[in-house]
């Protein structure tokens, strides 16, 4: 097979190539299937020396493939260095990939491996936890430089699909993307976030009997939360701050920003504030905004 790239045409770069990587058991294959359903050409664990050539072929204006995703995991020999070299080479060719890192907590990964009765690829003669921690150490540098980190610890397959779809909403138009997610501190703080906000300083609708059964997406709760002067001042200030931060994020090549808004249970205050914050951010030009309520259905 001839993998030589034509040199007489400019590469097609409207949609950047995507590299999906992360921890074994964190949902790499599931993410790949979602992208396939979205019309991406997805290939898994091809030798690193072929990745650049394949992406170049797809970048050719005459190629029928306009969206390509490469899934690469720790089973690739000398994984970390190889993948970093591939990313660097593609960037030098003007084909800088979007790197998506799939992550999950150790206890969740152990449960998933146990349920499937599988051993970890780096486990050797040790325990599952030993294999997972070895992989974390190898993958840490890739995670730190990833454009998007998706923590699948608390996501169902449907939640994961929604997260992938939301993160890729604006990619074709090269828009900066902001995901505003609400959560409850009692369920743990999200690890896949850039900016974390605590709105427990606001009056809690939970203690208003007639509001307790509702959620922050319901008008009675939303009206109650947003009627507070502190809520309005916070929203004004934070929206202004994020507008001011955007050029810096853009300069650093960070086009995917996650803002996490937390209250106690993730049902009322954080949901109402996240919805209103997203509404305001949608008024900002060239910004793609999505909302995710992580804990709204939890007890």
From Swiss-Prot:
The residues that the entry says bind ATP are 22-29
- Which regions form coiled coils? none
Keyword ATP-binding set for record = yes
* UniProt keywords, alphabetically: ATP-binding, GTP-binding, Nucleotide-binding
Q: Show the GO MF annotations.
A: ATP binding; GTP binding
Transmembrane: present as a keyword of the record?
no
Binding positions (GTP): 73-76
Q: Which SUPFAM superfamilies match?
A: P-loop containing nucleoside triphosphate hydrolases
> What's the domain of life for this entry?
Bacteria
Instruction: Note the InterPro entries from the entry.
Output: P-loop_NTPase, RapZ-like, RapZ-like_N, RapZ_C
| Classification via NCBIfam families | PRK05416.1 (NF003828)
HAMAP family to which the protein is assigned, alphabetical = RapZ_like (MF_00636)
Function comment: Displays ATPase and GTPase activities.
* Xref: PANTHER family: RNASE ADAPTER PROTEIN RAPZ
Q: What is stated as this protein's family in its record? A: Belongs to the RapZ-like family.
Question: What's the protein here called?
Answer: Nucleotide-binding protein DIP1313
Q: What organism does the record attribute this protein to? A: Corynebacterium diphtheriae (strain ATCC 700971 / NCTC 13129 / Biotype gravis)
């Amino acid at each position: 097979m001839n993998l030589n790239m034509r040199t007489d045409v400019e590469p097609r770069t409207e949609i950047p190539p995507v590299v999906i990587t992360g921890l074994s058991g964190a949902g790499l294959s599931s993410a790949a299937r979602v992208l396939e359903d979205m019309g991406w050409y997805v290939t898994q664990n091809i030798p690193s020396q072929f990745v650049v050539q394949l992406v170049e072929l797809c970048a050719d204006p005459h190629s029928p493939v306009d969206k390509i995703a490469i899934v690469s995991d720790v089973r690739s020999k000398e994984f970390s260095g190889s993948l970093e070299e591939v990313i660097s080479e593609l960037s030098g060719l003007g084909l800088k990939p979007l790197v998506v890192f799939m992550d999950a907590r150790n206890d969740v990964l152990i449960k998933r491996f146990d349920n499937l009765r599988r051993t970890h690829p780096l486990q050797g003669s040790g325990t599952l936890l030993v294999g997972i921690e070895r992989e974390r150490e190898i993958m840490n540098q890739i995670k730190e430089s990833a454009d998007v980190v998706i923590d699948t610890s608390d996501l169902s397959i449907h939640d994961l699909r929604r997260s992938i779809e939301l993160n890729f909403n604006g990619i074709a138009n090269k828009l900066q993307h902001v995901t505003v997610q609400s959560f409850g501190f009692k369920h743990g703080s999200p690890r896949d976030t850039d900016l974390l906000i605590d709105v427990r300083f606001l009056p809690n609708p939970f203690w208003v009997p007639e509001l307790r059964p509702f959620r922050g997406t319901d008008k009675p709760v939303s009206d109650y939360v947003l009627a507070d002067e502190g809520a309005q001042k916070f929203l004004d200030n934070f929206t202004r701050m994020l507008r001011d931060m955007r050029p810096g994020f853009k300069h650093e090549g960070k086009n995917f920003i996650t803002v996490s808004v937390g209250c106690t249970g993730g049902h009322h205050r954080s949901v109402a504030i996240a919805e209103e914050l997203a509404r305001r951010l949608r008024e900002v030009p060239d910004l793609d905004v999505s909302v995710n309520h992580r804990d709204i259905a939890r007890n």
